[in-house]
A protein has these predicted regions:
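Charged, helix-rich terminal subdomains or tails
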Residues: 1-323, 328-875
């Protein structure tokens, strides 16, 4: 395997369409576009892409990237250079397979990128992404409706290109090469495209422009790397190209279409929930965030470990998040099937996890070969479904990769020696070499990680020699992760960064430095000009963060009990869990469309990459922003929230990534935060009714165990998705349920939830002002229980069908009781509003459930503390 050739061909795949970006900005080319040039390279963008190579590729590699210029005309290189011709063939094939078709379309002017969510499940809404760098503030990255997708002022493209070109000159120039080898150069080129081409369409002529240049380019690079790693010979590539041009021919070339050219790989870390939440409540605020970041790093480094172990670049990591990852790798390894190598790598990872965590964590790894035919539209979903079937099978035996003798050791391992050995108060394991308060060294390091991440503006990943195994005596999360050949560090500022780089200079082989600060990007604090002494790649990484600091010096984070004390009304903290509904089905079936010719499926690897990356943008960037808006709007205890810094007053984001989130906060802040996140999500997915999100909220007293809180919130989320525990058993719902929130034990669709919130807000304000008797909420709740018991009794006795409307004494009791309460009210507007609520009760019996929930909510928000503190009312 030629490692340099793999990287060069991946780079050629990454840059093959750079000319499209340049031309849309009005950028000139080094050569004149005429008939000779057209005959030579076929399309203007190919010539412009070559101009980009000539300007930004270092001289030592520039001459080995001819495939960029000739990816539409490989034959023009046949008699010039075998290596160049092979590369051009590889890039052309990879380009076709990435787009899911033989793409030979004409060119046009500037166009906008359509959000991939605007077309899922038959939705057809013209929403387009702004031409903004990925590191820009979250509120600037939402799609918006546009009448004319091609009506983009050249100035917008020119501004984006200007920023991109400036970064390219700083990070890819000859002057920076003292800190770059080919691998770090490819990584930096990758991060540059991610930063600036995530919002640029790949193609648009005769096509819907819903795949970004970044996603198409990275998929092309991944396929090119696979073809090169498998050492595909030119004659075979020529046969495949002929077969792709004429896929219906039954000649000898057709066989190439059904020969696997790559392998889809899926990984799933198992045991995450138990590892995250099986900790004491006392230390939860310190430990939970560190544990979630550790698992995030573990998932990503495990994915990169597989990619590195197969000699592939970062482009072949299609997605990593939420404990899952997806890769595209070659079909062979050292003359054998790649599955054998994958199994060996999996065994290494599972061995390490068993050593470090005693079998609590495992890795399910599965793969399936994919043929050229399956890359094409109408077929890719078959390979994707096949992979997930294999993943489900692999998850049944997450430790199955262990040797039988080692598996017996892990399963039969005792829980400790007993006796006088100290037990860690966080994880409950026997503690050796821990802190004075008996916290074991690993838990102490995870607490430290949570604090580091809360302050960090940079993340540094250093390539180091791979540790042979993670010893059971590992003292920190860093020592565990070192078995992946990575040393991970977080830095607050340039001074910290310099100290980390100095410390790593003697033991690391190369560095990757990622800026985590929103709105600053790759150029923050002169990052590009920093002399790291080692080969270094640089980039920007979206990173969700929301921290309730106790002080402006950021020395301590509020505990969960602190958050409960800050709550309005009753002293409670809470957990909010949210995740996307039916995501697996959306990915499998979202691009299917029925027309006069039947059912078509436009899913391709590039579209899959686009949807996955878009979800990452929302959860890694927009969730924290939306939550901060809700926190800042609450106006509680001064101006503690700061959207620019991730400083929150009453919310602590423990995890956001993949397709879900876990957030802790003062109980009363959580429902409004959930509503704000849901509204932001709907805007982000172009108000597509098929792409929804659900939420579950659990309210807890101080000192309540976090593992129980997590399960209660998960149960609430499950109830929301099933639409149980509330109004939904009375009526069927669209979308198979889901698209709902469960709060105070009641499941509501989001519109009903907002109606309830408005009623609760008014009621709480009236109670605070003394405009209504304090007995009003209890009167409403008694009516609700009368309705509930009467309905249940009638159903049990067979006098009422489950979905039939129930009328009974509760109706006139409601009219009497609440009207009597209203008669005691002096404010005319308040009196009229309450009477309106009563008049609406018989028209839809779900109204009594909504009103009861509002009454309960208002009562909790205005309840006095036992210590005699003043009420903290309002919603």
């Amino acid at each position: 395997m030629d490692a340099e050739r793999i990287l060069l061909n991946a780079l050629a795949g990454l840059w093959h369409d750079m000319g499209k970006f340049a031309l849309r900005s009005g950028e000139g080319m080094r050569e004149v576009w005429d008939e000779h040039a057209k005959h030579d390279v076929a399309y203007r963008h190919a010539l412009a892409s070559d101009s980009f190579v000539q300007e930004y590729a270092p001289e030592r590699w520039r001459g080995r990237l001819a495939g960029v210029r000739y990816h539409h005309r490989p034959a023009n290189l046949r008699s010039i250079s075998d290596e160049a011709y092979s590369q051009a063939c590889v890039v052309q094939v990879a380009d076709w397979l990435s787009s899911g078709e033989r793409d030979e379309n004409a060119e046009g002017g500037p166009a906008r990128l359509r959000s991939p969510f605007s077309r899922l499940r038959g939705h057809d809404a013209p929403f387009y992404l702004p031409l903004k760098p990925l590191s820009d503030c979250s509120e600037h990255l939402f799609p918006s409706p546009c009448v004319d997708e091609k009506g983009v002022p050249v100035e917008e493209y020119r501004e984006l290109w200007s920023q991109f070109a400036a970064q390219a000159r700083q990070t890819l120039s000859e002057g920076s090469l003292h800190r770059m080898d080919l691998r770090t150069f490819v990584e930096t080129a990758y991060f540059l495209l991610q930063e600036y081409a995530w919002c640029v369409p790949s193609a648009y002529y005769n096509q819907v422009p819903d795949v970004s240049l970044f996603d198409h380019a990275r998929a092309t690079a991944a396929i090119a790397a696979c073809l090169t790693a498998d050492d595909r010979e030119v004659p075979w590539l020529e046969r495949l190209m002929r077969a792709i041009r004429s896929p219906r021919d039954d000649g000898n070339d057709a066989e190439a279409l059904d020969t696997p050219v790559a392998t889809l790989v899926g990984g799933d870390l198992t045991g995450l929930q138990r590892f995250l939440y099986s900790i004491s409540s006392e230390n939860a605020a310190k430990s939970l965030r560190g544990r979630s970041v550790y698992l995030q790093l573990l998932s990503e480094l495990a994915a990169e470990f597989v990619v590195d172990g197969l000699g592939l670049p970062i482009t072949n990591l299609l997605y990593a998040g939420g404990g899952n990852f997806y890769l595209l790798v070659q079909t062979t390894w050292e003359g054998d099937r790649v599955e054998k190598r994958l199994h060996a790598i999996q065994r290494q990872v599972v061995e390490m996890l068993a050593e470090a965590h005693g079998g609590d964590l495992g890795l399910a790894l599965a793969s399936t070969p994919i043929t050229p035919r399956e890359f094409f539209r109408g077929h890719f979903h078959e390979a994707w479904a096949r992979l997930h079937q294999e993943i489900r099978r692999a998850k049944q035996t997450p430790l199955g990769a262990l040797a039988p003798s080692r598996l017996a050791e892990v399963i039969g391992d005792g829980i400790g020696t007993g006796g006088e050995t100290a037990v860690c108060p966080v994880c409950g394991r026997e503690s050796e070499g821990g802190t004075e308060d008996r916290v074991c060294s690993i838990c102490a390091s995870l607490e430290s990680l949570g604090m580091q991440v809360a302050r960090a503006n940079y993340m540094v990943l250093a390539d180091i020699d791979i540790a042979p195994t993670a010893p059971q005596s590992a003292r920190s999360w860093q020592s565990i992760l070192s078995v992946f050949g990575r040393s991970v560090h977080f830095a607050k500022d340039a001074e910290d960064l310099a100290a980390i780089a100095e410390d790593l200079s003697a033991r690391a082989k190369r560095l990757r430095v990622l800026c985590l600060a929103e709105g600053r990007g790759m150029s923050a604090d002169g990052l590009n000009a920093f002399d790291f002494q080692l080969p270094t790649s640089v980039g920007y990484r979206p990173f969700a963060r929301l921290v309730p600091w106790r002080d402006r010096e950021e020395s301590q984070i509020k505990t969960f009990d602190d958050l409960a004390e800050q709550a309005k009304g009753i002293e409670r903290w809470g957990v909010l869990r949210m995740d996307v509904d039916n995501l697996g089905r959306l990915m499998r079936e979202g691009f299917r469309k029925r027309d006069a010719h039947g059912i078509s499926d436009s899913l391709t690897i590039s579209r899959l990459a686009s949807v996955s990356f878009a979800l990452r943008v929302f959860f890694d960037k927009c969730v924290a922003w939306a939550a901060l808006q809700a926190d800042a709007a609450s106006g509680v205890h001064g101006s503690g929230s700061c959207p620019d810094t991730g400083r929150s007053s009453r919310l602590y984001l423990q995890y956001a990534g993949g397709d879900d989130l876990f957030l802790v906060g003062a109980w009363d802040a959580l429902p409004l935060t959930a509503a704000e996140i849901q509204a932001a999500f709907q805007e982000f997915v172009c108000h597509n009714p098929a792409v929804t999100i659900s939420a579950g909220i659990a309210l807890l007293p101080p000192k309540f165990p976090i593992y129980q809180a997590a399960h209660l919130a998960l149960d609430a989320l499950g109830a929301a998705k099933a639409r149980t525990g509330g109004v939904f058993y009375l009526a069927s719902s669209e979308n198979g349920g889901k698209n709902a929130i469960n709060f105070l034990g009641v499941s509501l669709d989001w519109d009903s939830f907002r109606t309830v919130h408005e009623q609760a807000r008014k009621m709480a304000q009236w109670l605070e002002d003394g405009a209504v008797p304090r007995s009003l909420p209890q009167r409403i709740l008694r009516l609700y229980h009368e309705w509930y018991e009467g309905r249940r009794r009638s159903v049990r006795q067979g006098r009422l069908r489950p979905r039939q409307r129930y009328f009974g004494p509760w109706v006139w009791h409601a009219a009497y009781q609440i009207s009597r309460a209203a008669s005691e009210i002096e404010d005319t507007e308040v009196k009229q509003e309450i009477r309106r609520w009563v008049s609406e009760l018989p028209s839809d019996e779900r109204n009594i459930m909504r009103l009861a929930m509002a009454a309960r909510w208002a009562e909790l928000c205005t309840r006095k503390r036992k210590d005699g503190n003043a009420e903290r009312s309002g919603i």
